[in-house]
């Protein structure tokens, strides 16, 4: 695999990815193939009115295995407040149609005056779309979901992203809604849909089993703080494939939290990342196992392949495979960092069985291997890792095997 004019040039074997079904590289224990959109139970037509209650009623009345289809009418935009997906029911957004979040903080608050403010909590907003304890639900395109993160709120003098910037300055937390929040669910699908301008994280899959994002496009400015692309948290059996992700934070961030399930069996296959903070594991790493990242192009991310944590959130990371990755204009192509934010705590990183194979960075960068806080020296295996001659290495308490 090589990089050419920002596009893929694949070998014959990878040229057959249209036939992909649970690639040999996969760590996801499921057999995963390209999803198919379900048939619709009803079709809604867009007009100029706010459609929250109309869409929610249609979702509640839709039979399992079916989808509510959003199509163009007198308008191509559905304006809506927070929505909840029932179990077994999906949302299908037609070509050229946008489901747009209302730009009103009050609509998202989960307690009086809790959303659209900066405080020490940061949990005062409902997500735009929530799925909790669902099985076989999903969101399908080829339409778009727009979080309006950069638009001034009607009931505030600032945008969601302004709040995030203000929180950073004040060392507090912004109360801004995530775009899609999936909790304790099984076999959730995101297919052929575009996600733009999220106020906060775009997609979170938390405490679940079975998540597929396929042909998903995420595009949010690099300056939009805390706008992670896709974050699997304390979950298992995840596939992110054939997707294109550009954000203002981690393109993908795999996390595992204390007191919750381990995160395991993750496949990140045949993707392209633009701006963002890279393909990350952490900073919550209290049990991450069996991760495969294969056939990835990264252009303009601040970091490339990164495992990050510190004493406040570290734990076991084991069985991580990176292969066939090409990077360009990536400041730090490879990062292993046990002192990510220098936070204090009693947790010790225990990271092992980490392999980098057939990795190319085409522009100058810095490789950071910092095992300062590790339980024991971290061993990483590097095979056919190609960097430019002017790239540099920073190594502390890490052993590199070839």
From Swiss-Prot:
GO terms for cellular component: extracellular region. Gene3D superfamilies: Single-stranded right-handed beta-helix, Pectin lyase-like. GO terms for biological process: carbohydrate metabolic process; cell wall organization. Its main location: secreted. The active site is at residues 249, 277. Its EC number is 3.2.1.15. InterPro entries: GH28_Enzymes, Glyco_hydro_28, PbH1, Pectin_lyas_fold, Pectin_lyase_fold/virulence. Keywords: Cell wall biogenesis/degradation, Glycosidase, Hydrolase, Secreted, Signal. PANTHER family: PECTIN LYASE-RELATED (PTHR31339), PLASMIN AND FIBRONECTIN-BINDING PROTEIN A (PTHR31339:SF9). Belongs to the glycosyl hydrolase 28 family. Involved in maceration and soft-rotting of plant tissue. This is Endo-polygalacturonase.
């Amino acid at each position: 695999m090589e990089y050419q004019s920002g596009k893929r040039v694949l070998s014959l074997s990878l040229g057959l990815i249209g036939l992909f079904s649970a690639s040999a590289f996969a760590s996801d224990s499921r057999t995963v193939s390209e999803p198919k959109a379900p048939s619709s139970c009803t079709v809604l037509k867009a007009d100029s009115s706010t459609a929250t209650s109309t869409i929610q009623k249609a979702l509640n009345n839709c039979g399992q295995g079916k989808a509510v289809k959003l199509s163009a009418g007198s308008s191509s935009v559905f304006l809506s407040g927070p929505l909840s997906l029932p179990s077994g029911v999906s949302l299908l957004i037609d070509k050229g149609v946008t489901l747009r979040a209302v730009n009103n903080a009050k609509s998202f608050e989960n307690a009086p005056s809790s959303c659209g403010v900066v405080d020490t909590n940061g949990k005062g907003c409902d997500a735009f779309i929530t799925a909790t304890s669902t099985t076989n639900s999903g969101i399908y395109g080829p339409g778009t979901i727009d979080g309006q993160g950069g638009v001034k709120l009607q009931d505030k003098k600032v945008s969601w992203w302004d709040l995030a910037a203000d929180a950073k300055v004040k060392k507090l937390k912004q109360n801004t809604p995530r775009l899609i929040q999936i909790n304790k669910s099984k076999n959730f699908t995101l297919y052929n849909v575009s996600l733009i301008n999220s106020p906060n994280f775009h997609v979170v899959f938390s405490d679940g089993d079975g998540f597929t994002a396929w042909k998903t496009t995420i595009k949010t400015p690099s300056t939009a703080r805390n706008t992670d692309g896709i974050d699997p948290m304390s979950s298992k059996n995840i596939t992110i494939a054939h997707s294109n992700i550009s954000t203002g934070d981690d393109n993908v961030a795999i996390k595992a939290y204390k007191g919750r399930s381990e995160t395991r069996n993750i496949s990140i296959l045949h993707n392209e990342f633009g701006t963002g903070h890279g393909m990350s594991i952490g900073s919550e790493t209290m049990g991450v196992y069996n991760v495969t990242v294969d056939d990835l192009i990264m252009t303009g991310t601040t970091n490339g392949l990164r495992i990050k944590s510190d004493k406040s959130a570290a734990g076991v990371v084991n069985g991580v495979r990176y292969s066939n990755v090409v990077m360009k204009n990536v400041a730090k192509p490879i990062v292993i960092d046990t002192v990510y934010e220098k936070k204090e705590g009693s947790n010790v990183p225990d990271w092992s069985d980490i392999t980098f194979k057939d990795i190319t960075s085409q522009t100058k960068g810095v490789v950071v291997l910092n095992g300062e806080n590790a339980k024991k020296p971290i061993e990483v295996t590097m095979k056919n890792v190609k960097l430019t001659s002017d790239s540099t290495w920073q190594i502390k308490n890490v052993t590199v095997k070839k």
